[in-house]
Amino acid sequence: MNMTSFFRFEEELYSVGAGKDGIIIDVRENGGGSTTDHLLTILTQPRHAITVPRGGGRGYPQDRKVYASWHKPIVVLCNQNSYSNAEIFSHAIKHLKRGKVVGVPTAGGVISTGGRSIMDMGYLRMPFRGWYLMGTGEDMELNGAVPHYILWPKPGELPAGRDTQLRKAISVLKKEVKKYNNRPQPELKNATSKLKEKK
């Protein structure tokens, strides 16, 4: 979860995601990094207006935003090998109710670290920042993100090319897309002249 992968995510969100109804973000086997807040800027940006360009449909101009944004449904996949920033991301998606999380609880290895070289002895890493859940105050260290849908792979499934967690994520995403597409839309009311109303 570094800036190179973040910029690739932002680019592919529209190059690959264009016209799609939802996306699955897979942070399984992800060792972490530092891009959760950048990802959340894309995925949780509040909407304050609807725009309609001449001859076009409803939307909002992407060039007005810090990053391209995604408001359609998402599902996050995580597992026991999701660490650090991948866990913070999974916790955030669940806490903010931005999407559903599928997989197994993450490792519970959430702590910012730094380090120093030790003369003739290598490198010593030291924790310097703890991470706590908003609302409950629970320490994310030793408390992994718990998915909405817990599903452990059975022995032999992954080597055989069967990914039951991904299948579950697809099933959940389809339900979320259906709910999203059926949500009420505000009626757009065109401006009327105040002079006409006074007559």
Language model features: what each stretch is:
Residues Y132-G156:
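Active-site rim recognition segments
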Residues R58-Q62, S112, D120, A145, ...:
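A sequence-level detector of short, solvent-exposed, charge-rich linear segments
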Residues M1-G122, E157-Q165, S171-K179:
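Cleft-lining beta-strand/loop regions that shape enzyme active-site pockets
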Residues M140, G156-A160, T164, I170-K199:
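Conserved functional hotspot residues or short segments at active or partner-binding sites
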Residues V102, P127, I150-W152:
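Residues in well-ordered beta-strands of folded domains
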Residues P53-R58, L124-M140:
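Short, basic, helix/turn surface patches
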Residues F9-E12, G135, W152, R183:
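Generic signature of intrinsically disordered, low-complexity segments enriched in small/polar residues
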Residues K97, D120-L124, T136, A145-P147:
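A short pocket-lining beta-strand/turn micro-motif at the edge of beta-sheets
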